[in-house]
Amino acid sequence: MRLDKFLKVSRLIKRRTLAKEIADQGRIIVNGNKAKAATNIAVGDELKIQFGQKLLTIEIDALKETVKKDEASELYTIKQEEYIKAE
C-alpha cells in the first residue's frame, strides 16, 4: 500500500494530498529512510512523522483499503510521541 493512502485511511493525516506534501518536505521517515508519498509500506514497518513540533513514531499493524472511523487506530501502534523544542 502507498504511504499517502495508509496515512489517510488510518486517519493520521486528514487528506491524501496533505500526506503527499508532508512526505515531499522530508517529514516522514520509513524504516530509517526519508519516504516519498508513493513509497510502499508493509505490516511491521516503522514510521516517524513530524507534525510541527511533535514527532510521532508508529508501527504498522495492519493494512486495509478502507476502514471505519472507530477502527482506524487499530491499523497502527504508537511507539513514541515526543515534542521538539523550537530553536
List each language-model region with its residue ranges.
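Strongly charged
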Residues: K5, T17-E21, R27-E87
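Extended boundary segments
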Residues: M1-R11
